[in-house]
Amino acid sequence: MRQFIPMRRVLAVATLGALFWAAPASWAAAPPEAASCIACHGAGGMGNPAAGYPRLAGLPEQYLADQLRYFADGARNNAVMSGMAKPLSAAQVTALATYYSKLKPSGKPAPMPTGAAAAEGERLALRGDWEKGIPACIRCHGPGAVGVGENFPALVGQSAAYIEAQIKAWKDGSRSGDPLGLMHTVALRMTDAQTQAVAQWLAAQPLSPTKSASAKH
């Protein structure tokens, strides 16, 4: 007697199989917990820009581990990630952070904004707005915004939607854990228009800094 298999189950299995089929060769080294990450962050850890899910690939190991802990203890307010992070043991957090930190980021940047928005985004990212006490992004996140150390992650390779959402989260206090409260202080001084402009400009930058971009600060 043939057993009826619900179409929903067939589609779910097919989707999961497709995700694993598309996974990078390094997926063989992935910890089991990473299987829960790919639906939002992708098999290569580059996120889903359209949905606002961030890039994880190549971010600092300690930074990634810290973010999982912040989600678990509420320092970062996100219902989905809180539910994912709370059950993880310290060893599982370390394994996930180590794995994603070693993935090589890839992909194309978003289209460059035009007009006044592009000019304002570039100004804030490379020079800041010192009259309002807003330092340039590259002062902490490095030339090309590719990240510096464990506390200042790469901004390039992230979507405009994600960057904008995080600045707003720093501003309203739903995200914390920043060294010395730096991002909270900076975000409070930024207008919504500035937040959107710098997010769009950063999302349009290449994963590797160009000489011209690095030399403008």
Curated annotation (Swiss-Prot):
> Key word Lipoprotein present in the record?
no
- Specify the domain of life of the species encoding this protein: Bacteria
Task: State whether keyword RNA-binding applies.
Answer: no
Post-translational events: Binds 2 heme c groups covalently per subunit.
* One cellular component term from this protein's GO annotations in UniProt: periplasmic space
Which chain positions lie within coiled-coil regions?
A: none
PANTHER family membership: BLL4483 PROTEIN, CBB3-TYPE CYTOCHROME C OXIDASE SUBUNIT FIXP
This chain's protein is named Thiosulfate dehydrogenase electron acceptor
Instruction: Please tell me the species this chain comes from.
Output: Thiomonas intermedia (strain K12)
Q: Which gene encodes it?
A: tsdB
